[in-house]
Amino acid sequence: TNEIYPLNPIIGLIIQSKVNVSIPLSNKFGKTKGIFQPSEGSYVLLNWFGGGHPSQTVSKKILKGKNKHFRATLAASEIIFNGAPLIIKNPWNCFRISSIRKLLPKAKFIWLKRDIRKSAASDLESRYLTKKNPNKWNSATPSNIEKLKLLPPVHQVIENQFEFNRSIKANLKNIPSKNWITLWYEDILEDTNVELKKISSFLNRDYKFNTNKNKIKKKIRNISSEEQKEINKYVNIHSKRFKENLY
């Protein structure tokens, strides 16, 4: 859907609804293998919200004239999949919560937090693998990106992750608590079934998963030990500011 039908995602969703395939959930920086696997829907969202940087400023609202197509696509998806909720996981949406809330008053939000030391390390690794340069941003960018560019990469990624979390927290404050839930990535790794049950309950869906956590592979970060130490050091120095983002 994302790669072939970004302008008309319903075509891809209809095709997928007719094909019975096994869907492994493993991914690498939001990328999965196979045309029917989960996707961050970057190109689909680009069509609706645009792109550009800083994304917190220029890509936080739906584009003019796209409102109708956005709503129609989601409504059609609900029909195609017999009322199943459409879950969209994409880092750019960290800055679109307010806009999405206005477009979809009944929308629910899942805030999946992660220890900032780990999320920063993942952010840095993604720069090496996708941009071949630790100084180049891999994904969404906060409004203060020019200020963050003055920092070394190992500090940039920490502050970048902090801005994501700060924006999410600020926007969720304006939404009734029944419409959002907070989970920790670390808890999902520890007991996947328990956390998935929480999500299912939140979305008013029956829980039908049975995950063997022994099969979950713990990834070794492809960054230097010096970089990881510097990330840990910086977070420790500013631990008071980052305390809500530490697991």
Where in this protein do the model-derived segments appear?
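Short catalytic-loop micro-motif centered on adjacent basic/acidic residues
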Residues: 85-89, 182-184
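Conserved phosphate-donor/acceptor-positioning beta-strand/loop module used by diverse small-molecule
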Residues: 89-91, 100-125
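Short, solvent-exposed loop/turn segments at secondary-structure junctions
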Residues: 4-6, 92-95, 115-119, 125-128, ...
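N-terminal cationic-hydrophobic initiation segments that often serve targeting/anchoring roles
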Residues: 78, 101, 172-173
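PAPS-dependent sulfation machinery
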Residues: 2-86
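PAPS-dependent sulfotransferases, especially Golgi type II membrane carbohydrate sulfotransferases
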Residues: 124-247
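Soluble or luminal CAZymes and related metallo-dependent hydrolases
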Residues: 62-70, 89-92, 156-164, 191
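A structural signal for short coil/turn segments at secondary-structure junctions
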Residues: 81, 104, 175-176
